[in-house]
């Protein structure tokens, strides 16, 4: 038995091996649509507690594994989790997302940021990832994840999520030198954090550039792409064999650029037909996605038809089945179960 045959299904596909069906997991698969999660949330109402107390985060991460046996089990965390380690204090408000206590608006604030030391700032991440690897063994692939420089900068500068991103765009277009300094520091910290996750047990890492789709293609080329490349290059220097995934929300306008990031796998959202995505990204690029999360409100037949359509368009190599973004909080849990059941039968359905 070679190493290949004992590696978990998703990891094999992510490396480019031919597998009998596309592996499947779901973004935000640990979350509010699950009764088990809602029950736990009553006991631990703070998101930071749920994601930073190891035994709680381990339990949450494993809830979908125990319920549905996805091919990927992802660390339960948030993209802003490493920011306090740089000196950017924050909290995560229930239903509202990250709140930055002192938004980064000046050169002096950027100069005060410190390099990330994950062993000191984020020791719980190692504990969680080691436990997940031990729990799932070779039955599933453990995924880590990080935020991308532009998206973390957007939170740090805006102070919270935004519909217009007017503050960071003002900085980008009026005082780009300051923003580039911030993006550089964030890129180096994110690379350190991703390496720490891999060393702690993550077998695949996904980078979320959630807000880069808010940029025009020319501004993406200036403020997002070079820093995605910087992160991925640094990870690959030390961990060349770890597959890296890139997600950009609303990425239809920058899909080809995502393929230039250094990622091994590009997450496609539902605004791009999967067949078109394959054509635009080229035969060598692996893809992930791309069902509209809203499909999971529908009948079982509709869900099955959409899964089969997506998988046929993606072809029989280099595809990880997923939604185009996170599962929605009011999704019927039994429909998530059906999604996974159907995915596991794709070797006979397609």
Curated annotation (Swiss-Prot):
Pathway(s) it belongs to: Porphyrin-containing compound metabolism; protoporphyrin-IX biosynthesis; coproporphyrinogen-III from 5-aminolevulinate: step 4/4
Residues annotated to bind substrate: 28-32, 47, 78, 155, 210, 325
Entry-linked SUPFAM superfamilies: UROD/MetE-like
InterPro entries linked to this entry: UROD/MetE-like_sf, Uroporphyrinogen_deCO2ase_HemE, Uroporphyrinogen_deCOase
Gene3D superfamilies, A to Z: 3.20.20.210
Catalytic activity annotation: uroporphyrinogen III + 4 H(+) = coproporphyrinogen III + 4 CO2
Protein name from the UniProt record: Uroporphyrinogen decarboxylase
Gene that encodes the chain: hemE
